[in-house]
Amino acid sequence: CYFQNCPRGXXXAMSDLELRQCLPCGPGGKGRCFGPSICCGDELGCFVGTAEALRCQEEIYLPSPCQSGQKPCGSGGRCAAAGICCNDESCVTEPECREGIGFPRRVXASDRSNATLLDGPSGALLLRLVQLAAAPEPAEPAQPGVY
């Protein structure tokens, strides 16, 4: 079960147990479940309500509590990917999750400039974050998709 929504019996026994990492998910199992429909990883970004996050529904039925992410952020969330904070229900952009433990900048020594490499999912995530930052606030809740 997810730490935030475990039944009283399972969460009360938390002092006796150590929290385990939630189930792996996403392409190649490189992400971790943050909620029943949220899968995030350093290299992947976050999948919300997509096929990549389907496995995360299994976590609800496991008796021991789990928690993904290392650094607390936002309102009861944890840093899920570079610049993203998630709780078990949703994700938001969060500057304090941009760099640090688990989200190092990668710089190639062979590059003539000291720019950060943005390959594949990292570049796509950055582009999406820039688009989201420039977009007006949506009038209705976000639809399932890749963020």
Swiss-Prot record:
Disulfide partners: C1-C6, C22-C66, C25-C39, C33-C56, C40-C46, C73-C85, C79-C97, C86-C91
Modified residues (Glycine amide): G9
GO biological process: vasoconstriction
Upper classification of the organism: Eukaryota, Metazoa, Chordata, Craniata, Vertebrata
Organism name: Ovis aries
Predominant place of localization: secreted
Protein name per the record: Vasopressin-neurophysin 2-copeptin
Biological function: Neurophysin 2 specifically binds vasopressin.
Homology family: Belongs to the vasopressin/oxytocin family.
Compartment annotation: Secreted
Subunit structure: Interacts with vasopressin receptors V1bR/AVPR1B (Ki=85 pM), V1aR/AVPR1A (Ki=0.6 nM) and V2R/AVPR2 (Ki=4.9 nM). Interacts with oxytocin receptor (OXTR) (Ki=110 nM).
Keywords: Amidation, Cleavage on pair of basic residues, Disulfide bond, Glycoprotein, Hormone, Secreted, Vasoactive, Vasoconstrictor
Pfam families in alphabetical order: Hormone_4 (PF00220), Hormone_5 (PF00184)
Signal peptide: none
Misc. comment: X's have been placed at positions 10-12 and 108 by homology with the complete sequence of the bovine precursor.
Residues bearing attached sugar chains per UniProt: N114
